[in-house]
A protein has these predicted regions:
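Conserved alpha/beta-hydrolase
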Residues: 65-89
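N-terminal cap/lid segment of alpha/beta-hydrolase-fold proteins
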Residues: 1-43
Length: 337
């Protein structure tokens, strides 16, 4: 079973340069009626698609079956088209830096969207926004919002390089409302869209709401995890970034917008629950290289990294029976985090 038709479709501006990105969200069955919605665990997941130049888009079949499994597990599943894919504006870059900005835009949307829903669905919960929030490395400790940062192939490369959660919260919490030319900043446009889609989601289950204009993203405890499907390793990953280190540039009307360094992917993936899912017949990265990398990640201090290698699976997951085994591995991991 693939992803069903989207619950909501919309466009977001990229924080990199304002490029319009085609986006959609799929709501799980628990959010179809008010009774089950109030007990929904507030889980979301992003699944980014493979390289647009080679035909990648959010309708990719691997994005579909991974997203379907996440949806069945109760996650709100969000997908978007990078620049140059589908009806998104622009074209694929040579450096992946614009695409990193695209992912960050949708990441920020999902954080705010889940935040709006959490406060609306648990109105009796006391939240003291004067206390500093706690970023959880896992969801075994109490957490209000859990977001899985996922991607397939090129999408996993971009997901691996996003800024830290603290940086993301600050970027969207303290974004200026307008640019010096009185245009809404991309971050504020994204927040407005998150509020609009949250309101539509609540109206769909006939639930009244009074959403804040600007959500306090630090009032709730948020945790993140990583899901990397057919991850790309050097030298392929280096070719796609022209051998440069990824960093985030944010659009402003000033000559030089904020430049945000990104953390080392290995540090983020070992310190948060992470699943790398790949086949032993991957044509882009050898099984030996993937196993060696995974073993090194597993043995980092206090690592929360896990991997599953699916026998007989290639990079495109078209071989007989491999999708079923991949779904089983993903379902097992989701039950553990």
């Amino acid at each position: 079973m693939d992803l069903p038709p989207a619950s909501f479709s919309f466009f977001l501006p990229s924080v990199y340069d304002g490029t319009k990105l085609e986006c959609r969200v799929h709501l799980p069955s628990m959010l179809q009626n008010i009774e089950s919605a109030t007990t929904w665990p507030n889980r979301g997941a992003i699944v980014a698609h493979p390289y647009a130049t080679l035909g990648g888009c959010y309708d990719d079949p691997v994005v579909g079956f991974i997203g379907s499994e996440l949806l069945q597990a109760g996650c709100i599943v969000g997908t978007f088209n990078f620049r140059g894919a589908g009806d998104s504006e622009g074209r694929t870059s040579w450096t992946a830096k614009p695409e990193l900005g695209d992912y960050v835009s949708f990441y920020g949307f999902m954080l705010q969207y889940l935040h709006f829903l959490k406060l609306a669905l648990t109105p009796g919960e006391e939240v003291d926004s004067s206390k500093p929030h706690k970023v959880s490395d896992g969801v075994k400790n109490r957490t209000d919002i859990h977001l899985i940062l996922g991607g397939y192939s090129y999408g996993s490369l971009i997901a691996s390089n996003v800024p830290t959660l603290d940086t993301m919260l600050d970027l969207f919490q303290f974004a200026p409302i307008t640019t010096p030319t009185n245009k809404p900043t991309p971050m504020r446009e994204i927040m407005s869209t998150a509020k609009r889609i949250a309101a539509l989601s609540l109206e769909q289950i006939q639930m009244s709401h009074n959403l804040a204009d600007v959500p306090d993203l630090r009032a709730l405890t948020t945790s993140i995890s990583y899901l990397l499907v057919s991850p790309l390793l050097p030298p392929i990953s280096q070719f796609l970034t022209v051998f440069s280190t990824l960093s985030l540039n944010v659009k402003t009307d000033t000559p030089k917008g904020p430049h945000i360094p990104c953390p080392r992917p290995a540090d983020q993936q070992s310190s948060h629950h992470t699943l790398a899912l790949f086949g032993d017949q991957d044509t882009f990265t050898s099984a030996g290289k993937l196993e060696k990398w995974s073993d090194e990640m597993v043995h980092m201090p206090c690592s929360q990294f896990q991997f599953r290698m699916i026998d007989g699976a290639g990079h495109f997951w078209r071989e007989n029976g491999v999708e079923v085994r991949a779904r089983h591995a993903l379902k097992q991991w989701l039950s553990e985090i």
